[in-house]
Amino acid sequence: MTCGLLSVTVTFRRPAKWPGYFRHLCCRGAVMDLGPMRKSYRGDREAFEEAHLTSLDPMKQFASWFEEAVQCPDIGEANAMCLATCTRDGKPSARMLLLKGFGKDGFRFFTNYESRKGKELDSNPFASLVFYWEPLNRQVRVEGPVKKLPEKEAENYFHSRPKSSQIGAVVSRQSSVIPDREYLRKKNEELGQLYREQEVPKPEYWGGYILYPQVMEFWQGQTNRLHDRIVFRRGLATGDSPLGPMTHHGEEDWVYERLAP
């Protein structure tokens, strides 16, 4: 007698014992239904209205939300962000890294040019950033072209880092295949001895980027799922054609709109 059952759908609720619970289900070929996993966000009285914008310049609005995130004791790294890049033929990749500066011109981050993201930015210099501040029920999404920062700026930032981090950047040819972790340990120890009394030179393959924002979307969660989304866009040729009734002028060349959640 054979059984034709290929998989089982398991509706997730908090198990009596956590350790190994998901691994146990996966090993049994179960499909985990996580639909019931949800939490309450904000109430309608806390909705993010257009009148609540601190500025019609989205970079200033970002600065306001970022400051709140930095001051929130439940957020460990307010500058943590997801960077999404894409190959020329449309294959995306994403990873978490840290924002290292922002200003009127854009968002700065540093990495290894030989990494996957570095190669993708070289062949397709456009990217998206996502900041998610879960305790505040807020998210900011940014899109735009990316350019390498001047070598001098990268050099200055590199040498502002702890020496151990500088050595780590030299040790790791990011995204390359290595035999094991011991390989990294040995190389790190060797370079630690080599540069004990001297400056660590910045590798040519390490540097920074700036993302020039063309789209910035501010999202705030609502318990009833009628989330707030206000998006700013620029670079639009609006001079010869009037804006629609739901599109509004922001500062400089920005316009903004409310999007359905």
From Swiss-Prot:
Which body tissues produce this protein? Detected in adult liver.
Q: Record-annotated residues binding pyridoxal 5'-phosphate? A: R42, G43, D44, R45, K100, Y157, R161, S165, R225, L226, H227
SUPFAM superfamilies this protein is in?
Answer: FMN-binding split barrel
Q: Does the keyword Flavoprotein apply?
A: yes
- Keyword GTP-binding applies: no
Residue spans making up a coiled coil are none
Family under the similarity heading: Belongs to the pyridoxamine 5'-phosphate oxidase family.
- PANTHER family annotated for this entry? PYRIDOXINE-5'-PHOSPHATE OXIDASE, PYRIDOXINE-5-PHOSPHATE OXIDASE
Q: What is this protein called?
A: Pyridoxine-5'-phosphate oxidase
In its UniProt entry, the species of origin is given as: Rattus norvegicus (Rat)
Q: Identify the taxonomic lineage of the organism of origin.
A: Eukaryota, Metazoa, Chordata, Craniata, Vertebrata
